[in-house]
Amino acid sequence: MALPLPPGLTPPEIAFLCEMELVTVIPRQRLEGLELLGGRIKPLNPPHRTNVPLWLALLLKRQRRANILPPPWLNSHSLTAILDHEIDHDETFSPPPRLPPQPSANTLPTSPPFLSDNTADAAPDALPYHWLEIGEMLLEAASDDFEDPDNVRKLLRGLREVRMAKLRSGVEVLDAGGGVKMNGVGGMEVGEGRAFVTGVIDGLRKIAASREQQRRDRDREELENGYSGTAADYDDDEMDMQ
Protein backbone atom coordinates (compact mmCIF):
# COMPACT_ATOMS: atom_id res chain seq x y z
CA MET A 1 0.00 0.00 0.00
CA ALA A 2 1.45 3.35 -1.02
CA LEU A 3 1.91 5.99 1.63
CA PRO A 4 -0.02 9.25 1.20
CA LEU A 5 1.93 12.08 -0.38
CA PRO A 6 2.89 14.97 1.90
CA PRO A 7 0.98 18.22 1.32
CA GLY A 8 2.69 20.82 -0.80
CA LEU A 9 5.94 20.56 -2.74
CA THR A 10 8.90 18.61 -1.40
CA PRO A 11 12.42 20.18 -1.42
CA PRO A 12 13.51 18.12 -4.48
CA GLU A 13 10.43 19.28 -6.38
CA ILE A 14 11.14 22.91 -5.44
CA ALA A 15 14.72 22.54 -6.64
CA PHE A 16 13.45 21.05 -9.92
CA LEU A 17 11.15 24.03 -10.52
CA CYS A 18 14.04 26.36 -9.71
CA GLU A 19 15.94 25.05 -12.74
CA MET A 20 13.59 27.06 -14.96
CA GLU A 21 14.92 30.35 -13.54
CA LEU A 22 16.92 32.49 -15.95
CA VAL A 23 20.64 33.01 -15.33
CA THR A 24 23.36 34.72 -17.34
CA VAL A 25 26.07 32.75 -19.13
CA ILE A 26 29.16 33.73 -21.09
CA PRO A 27 29.49 31.18 -23.91
CA ARG A 28 32.88 29.78 -24.84
CA GLN A 29 31.79 28.61 -28.29
CA ARG A 30 29.08 29.43 -30.76
CA LEU A 31 25.82 27.51 -30.36
CA GLU A 32 22.64 27.68 -32.41
CA GLY A 33 19.38 28.88 -30.88
CA LEU A 34 16.91 26.45 -29.33
CA GLU A 35 13.13 26.28 -29.41
CA LEU A 36 11.96 25.30 -25.92
CA LEU A 37 8.58 25.12 -24.21
CA GLY A 38 9.48 28.15 -22.13
CA GLY A 39 10.40 30.19 -25.20
CA ARG A 40 13.15 30.55 -27.74
CA ILE A 41 16.80 30.63 -26.66
CA LYS A 42 18.88 33.07 -28.68
CA PRO A 43 22.06 31.84 -30.40
CA LEU A 44 25.12 31.90 -28.16
CA ASN A 45 27.96 33.98 -29.56
CA PRO A 46 31.16 34.39 -27.51
CA PRO A 47 31.82 36.57 -25.62
CA HIS A 48 28.33 38.08 -25.51
CA ARG A 49 26.24 37.40 -22.42
CA THR A 50 22.98 35.52 -22.80
CA ASN A 51 20.19 34.63 -20.38
CA VAL A 52 19.25 30.94 -20.41
CA PRO A 53 17.34 28.63 -18.04
CA LEU A 54 19.38 27.34 -15.12
CA TRP A 55 19.21 23.71 -16.26
CA LEU A 56 20.73 24.65 -19.62
CA ALA A 57 23.39 26.79 -17.98
CA LEU A 58 24.41 23.88 -15.72
CA LEU A 59 24.55 21.56 -18.74
CA LEU A 60 26.74 23.98 -20.71
CA LYS A 61 28.97 24.43 -17.67
CA ARG A 62 29.49 20.67 -17.29
CA GLN A 63 30.32 20.46 -20.99
CA ARG A 64 32.75 23.39 -20.61
CA ARG A 65 30.88 25.34 -23.24
CA ALA A 66 30.04 28.35 -21.07
CA ASN A 67 30.76 30.09 -17.80
CA ILE A 68 27.97 31.15 -15.46
CA LEU A 69 27.88 34.75 -14.28
CA PRO A 70 26.58 34.82 -10.67
CA PRO A 71 23.77 37.33 -10.04
CA PRO A 72 24.76 40.57 -8.24
CA TRP A 73 23.11 39.51 -4.97
CA LEU A 74 25.24 36.34 -4.85
CA ASN A 75 28.54 37.87 -3.79
CA SER A 76 30.19 38.49 -0.44
CA HIS A 77 29.43 42.21 -0.26
CA SER A 78 25.72 41.92 -1.08
CA LEU A 79 25.14 38.86 1.11
CA THR A 80 26.86 40.54 4.05
CA ALA A 81 24.58 43.58 3.73
CA ILE A 82 21.48 41.37 3.48
CA LEU A 83 22.59 39.30 6.49
CA ASP A 84 23.08 42.47 8.54
CA HIS A 85 19.56 43.56 7.60
CA GLU A 86 18.15 40.19 8.68
CA ILE A 87 19.91 40.41 12.04
CA ASP A 88 18.91 44.04 12.70
CA HIS A 89 15.22 43.44 11.83
CA ASP A 90 14.24 40.41 13.87
CA GLU A 91 10.52 40.59 13.06
CA THR A 92 10.60 40.97 9.26
CA PHE A 93 12.47 39.43 6.35
CA SER A 94 14.57 41.37 3.89
CA PRO A 95 12.36 42.77 1.10
CA PRO A 96 12.14 40.71 -2.11
CA PRO A 97 12.99 42.15 -5.54
CA ARG A 98 10.53 44.62 -6.99
CA LEU A 99 8.22 43.33 -9.67
CA PRO A 100 8.68 44.85 -13.13
CA PRO A 101 6.03 47.36 -14.24
CA GLN A 102 3.05 45.88 -16.03
CA PRO A 103 3.23 46.78 -19.75
CA SER A 104 -0.50 47.40 -20.11
CA ALA A 105 -3.82 46.64 -18.49
CA ASN A 106 -4.52 43.90 -21.05
CA THR A 107 -1.37 41.86 -20.35
CA LEU A 108 -0.70 39.51 -17.47
CA PRO A 109 2.07 40.44 -15.01
CA THR A 110 5.39 38.66 -15.38
CA SER A 111 6.16 36.06 -12.73
CA PRO A 112 8.92 33.49 -12.04
CA PRO A 113 10.64 31.88 -13.82
CA PHE A 114 10.49 34.65 -16.46
CA LEU A 115 11.91 37.39 -14.24
CA SER A 116 15.51 38.61 -14.25
CA ASP A 117 15.99 38.17 -10.49
CA ASN A 118 18.91 35.75 -11.00
CA THR A 119 20.54 37.25 -14.08
CA ALA A 120 23.38 39.75 -14.29
CA ASP A 121 20.75 42.53 -14.28
CA ALA A 122 19.23 41.51 -10.94
CA ALA A 123 19.05 43.83 -7.94
CA PRO A 124 22.09 43.44 -5.64
CA ASP A 125 20.20 44.08 -2.40
CA ALA A 126 17.25 41.67 -2.59
CA LEU A 127 16.94 37.90 -2.31
CA PRO A 128 14.76 36.32 -5.03
CA TYR A 129 12.21 33.60 -4.37
CA HIS A 130 14.63 30.76 -5.19
CA TRP A 131 17.70 32.36 -3.62
CA LEU A 132 18.75 29.32 -1.59
CA GLU A 133 18.40 26.80 -4.40
CA ILE A 134 20.13 29.06 -6.92
CA GLY A 135 23.03 29.68 -4.57
CA GLU A 136 23.59 26.03 -3.71
CA MET A 137 23.35 24.85 -7.33
CA LEU A 138 25.73 27.49 -8.66
CA LEU A 139 28.26 26.91 -5.88
CA GLU A 140 28.18 23.18 -6.53
CA ALA A 141 28.48 23.31 -10.32
CA ALA A 142 30.31 26.60 -10.96
CA SER A 143 32.33 27.48 -7.88
CA ASP A 144 35.22 28.55 -10.12
CA ASP A 145 33.03 31.37 -11.46
CA PHE A 146 32.88 33.00 -7.98
CA GLU A 147 35.47 35.38 -6.59
CA ASP A 148 35.27 33.91 -3.06
CA PRO A 149 33.11 30.76 -3.12
CA ASP A 150 33.95 29.69 0.43
CA ASN A 151 32.84 32.99 1.92
CA VAL A 152 29.69 33.04 -0.22
CA ARG A 153 28.85 29.53 0.96
CA LYS A 154 29.39 30.60 4.57
CA LEU A 155 27.15 33.66 4.19
CA LEU A 156 24.40 31.59 2.57
CA ARG A 157 24.52 29.18 5.49
CA GLY A 158 24.28 32.07 7.94
CA LEU A 159 21.35 33.60 6.07
CA ARG A 160 19.54 30.28 6.06
CA GLU A 161 19.95 29.80 9.80
CA VAL A 162 18.90 33.35 10.70
CA ARG A 163 15.83 33.33 8.47
CA MET A 164 14.66 29.86 9.56
CA ALA A 165 15.01 30.87 13.22
CA LYS A 166 13.00 33.99 12.46
CA LEU A 167 10.32 31.92 10.73
CA ARG A 168 10.04 29.52 13.68
CA SER A 169 9.89 32.30 16.26
CA GLY A 170 7.17 34.07 14.28
CA VAL A 171 5.03 30.95 14.12
CA GLU A 172 5.50 30.06 17.79
CA VAL A 173 3.81 33.27 18.97
CA LEU A 174 0.66 32.60 16.99
CA ASP A 175 -2.66 32.10 18.69
CA ALA A 176 -5.75 30.42 17.28
CA GLY A 177 -6.82 33.50 15.33
CA GLY A 178 -3.46 35.14 14.68
CA GLY A 179 -1.21 35.40 11.67
CA VAL A 180 2.41 35.96 10.76
CA LYS A 181 3.80 38.17 8.01
CA MET A 182 5.85 36.07 5.59
CA ASN A 183 6.73 38.61 2.89
CA GLY A 184 10.10 37.74 1.39
CA VAL A 185 10.17 34.07 2.42
CA GLY A 186 11.79 31.88 -0.24
CA GLY A 187 10.50 28.75 -1.92
CA MET A 188 12.83 26.29 -0.19
CA GLU A 189 12.18 27.97 3.16
CA VAL A 190 8.45 27.41 2.68
CA GLY A 191 9.06 23.77 1.75
CA GLU A 192 11.37 23.09 4.70
CA GLY A 193 9.23 24.95 7.23
CA ARG A 194 5.90 23.57 6.06
CA ALA A 195 5.92 20.61 8.48
CA PHE A 196 6.78 22.82 11.45
CA VAL A 197 4.23 25.49 10.56
CA THR A 198 1.41 23.03 9.92
CA GLY A 199 2.23 21.23 13.17
CA VAL A 200 1.92 24.45 15.16
CA ILE A 201 -1.33 25.40 13.43
CA ASP A 202 -2.82 21.94 14.00
CA GLY A 203 -1.86 22.19 17.66
CA LEU A 204 -3.56 25.57 17.95
CA ARG A 205 -6.69 24.19 16.32
CA LYS A 206 -6.80 21.29 18.77
CA ILE A 207 -6.37 23.64 21.73
CA ALA A 208 -9.14 25.90 20.44
CA ALA A 209 -11.43 22.91 19.84
CA SER A 210 -10.73 21.61 23.35
CA ARG A 211 -11.55 24.98 24.90
CA GLU A 212 -14.75 25.22 22.90
CA GLN A 213 -15.79 21.74 24.01
CA GLN A 214 -15.07 22.60 27.64
CA ARG A 215 -17.20 25.73 27.34
CA ARG A 216 -20.08 23.78 25.86
CA ASP A 217 -19.85 21.13 28.59
CA ARG A 218 -19.85 23.83 31.26
CA ASP A 219 -22.89 25.53 29.73
CA ARG A 220 -24.75 22.22 29.55
CA GLU A 221 -23.97 21.40 33.18
CA GLU A 222 -25.16 24.83 34.29
CA LEU A 223 -28.44 24.35 32.42
CA GLU A 224 -28.94 20.91 33.94
CA ASN A 225 -28.30 22.29 37.45
CA GLY A 226 -30.91 25.01 37.03
CA TYR A 227 -28.48 27.85 36.43
CA SER A 228 -30.46 31.02 35.75
CA GLY A 229 -27.74 33.60 35.14
CA THR A 230 -24.93 35.45 36.86
CA ALA A 231 -25.16 38.32 39.29
CA ALA A 232 -24.40 40.68 36.46
CA ASP A 233 -27.32 39.26 34.49
CA TYR A 234 -29.60 39.79 37.53
CA ASP A 235 -28.51 43.41 37.89
CA ASP A 236 -29.15 44.03 34.19
CA ASP A 237 -32.64 42.57 34.43
CA GLU A 238 -33.39 44.67 37.50
CA MET A 239 -32.31 47.85 35.69
CA ASP A 240 -34.56 46.99 32.75
CA MET A 241 -37.55 46.63 35.09
CA GLN A 242 -36.87 50.07 36.55
UniProtKB/Swiss-Prot annotation:
Pro residues bias locations: 94-103
InterPro entries: GINS_A (IPR021151), GINS_bundle-like_dom_sf (IPR036224), GINS_Psf2 (IPR007257), PSF2_N (IPR056784)
Protein name: DNA replication complex GINS protein PSF2
Annotated source species: Phaeosphaeria nodorum (strain SN15 / ATCC MYA-4574 / FGSC 10173)
Region (Disordered) location: 89-110, 209-242
Biased composition (Acidic residues): 233-242
Skewed-composition ranges (Basic and acidic residues): 212-223
Localization annotation: Nucleus
Pfam families xref list: PSF2_N, Sld5
